[in-house]
């Protein structure tokens, strides 16, 4: 009996020794912990996980603008139908312009009320029902980015917001394809729906665009990251060497003034007191003159100014009678006849003599010979 008792624990311990030790978090590689396996999906929360339901009732309400009233009224039955599947009540108040969602006694998922709250927020921010209803899925999240307070100047804000959208929405479409998110720009907010990794990139791009960084730089970086993620060897390595480094150029657009004022050196002493009219007269000696003498000096100064102005005016008038300077005429020298183009005088004289002897319309000697030969040939043929 004793031997059997001793053998019992030994066999159990032997089995434990044969088993492979369980891998602890310390033994695992850090990269394996951080990477999510492909195709992994979080298990859905079912009624079996919380059979007794919730203890208290929770509710959320949000306001919506006037222009969304017609659309919400039209699609509200679909919203109620989708939320009733998760045992959430939804009410639309058109008088106050608000939407309310609240839990019931049958609600078993504690987080579904947060997703219902995000649903009505997205509907209020002009997101369509088809896209907003995706928020009720477990692997989908949303982010509403407020951009209204990031730029003070209204014109600058509109320009940067349009830069985010791009010509015919091309920039926004490229961002949606790279991040796998649906993005809606409306007013002072940017609404995004998609996976968590994509929402993080969307927020970064939107905030950088509002900080005057063009979205094309971030889109180029995202394209490179997407290609690098396909390589399994590069997943655990740093990607800094592959990503482009853009230099920010801060161009000063401030126009420099034409007249630059140079600041005077600081002195602790006050500036000297300016001279008054009496001080100036005392310095020049006019203060001691009589009134008649002062008047005479004043008249002389006026006459001198008038004479100077008259002489200037006369000079300007005389300018019209001064002829303009003519350009010097350069006479061209006759070109000397070249030796190649010299005329043969003797041959020319002979030609003139022949022309004088010749009658008008008469044939030349050569032409006469040719004619005679032609006549002889005709006679022979006959």
From Swiss-Prot:
* Compositional bias (Basic and acidic residues): 16-31, 39-51
Query: Which ranges are annotated Polar residues under compositional bias?
Result: 1-14
- The signal peptide, as residue positions, is none
Listed GO CC annotations: nucleolus; small-subunit processome
CDD domains registered for this protein in UniProt? KH-I_KRR1_rpt1, KH-I_KRR1_rpt2
Residues bearing PTM Phosphoserine: 3
Q: Where would I find the Glycyl lysine isopeptide (Lys-Gly) (interchain with G-Cter in SUMO2) crosslink on this chain?
A: 342, 371
GO molecular function annotations of the record: RNA binding
Q: Where is this region: Disordered?
A: 1-51, 250-278, 307-338
Gene3D superfamilies, per this entry? Answer: K Homology domain, type 1 (3.30.1370.10)
Q: Mind listing the UniProt keywords for this protein, alphabetically?
A: Acetylation, Isopeptide bond, Nucleus, Phosphoprotein, Ribonucleoprotein, Ribosome biogenesis, RNA-binding, rRNA processing, Ubl conjugation
Identify one Pfam family in the record: KH_KRR1_2nd
Q: Which InterPro entries match?
A: KH_dom, KH_dom_type_1_sf, KRR1-like_KH1, KRR1-like_KH1_euk, KRR1-like_KH2, KRR1-like_KH2_euk, rRNA_assembly_KRR1
Location of N-acetylalanine modifications:
2
Tell me where on the tree of life, at the top rank, the source sits. Answer: Eukaryota
List residues of the KH domain: 154-206
Instruction: Give me the stretches of Basic residues compositional bias.
Output: 250-262
* SMART domains tied to this protein: KH (SM00322)
Primary location recorded for the protein, binned into one broad class: nucleus
Q: Where in the cell is it found?
A: Nucleus, Nucleolus
Q: What are its GO biological-process terms?
A: ribosomal small subunit biogenesis; rRNA processing
Family matches, as PANTHER family:
HIV-1 REV BINDING PROTEIN 2, 3, KRR1 SMALL SUBUNIT PROCESSOME COMPONENT HOMOLOG
What subunit structure does UniProt give? Answer: Part of the small subunit (SSU) processome, composed of more than 70 proteins and the RNA chaperone small nucleolar RNA (snoRNA) U3.
Q: According to its UniProt entry, what is the function of this protein?
A: Part of the small subunit (SSU) processome, first precursor of the small eukaryotic ribosomal subunit. During the assembly of the SSU processome in the nucleolus, many ribosome biogenesis factors, an RNA chaperone and ribosomal proteins associate with the nascent pre-rRNA and work in concert to generate RNA folding, modifications, rearrangements and cleavage as well as targeted degradation of pre-ribosomal RNA by the RNA exosome.
Q: Of which family is this protein a member?
A: Belongs to the KRR1 family.
Can you name this protein? Answer: KRR1 small subunit processome component homolog
What organism is listed for this UniProt entry? Bos taurus (Bovine)
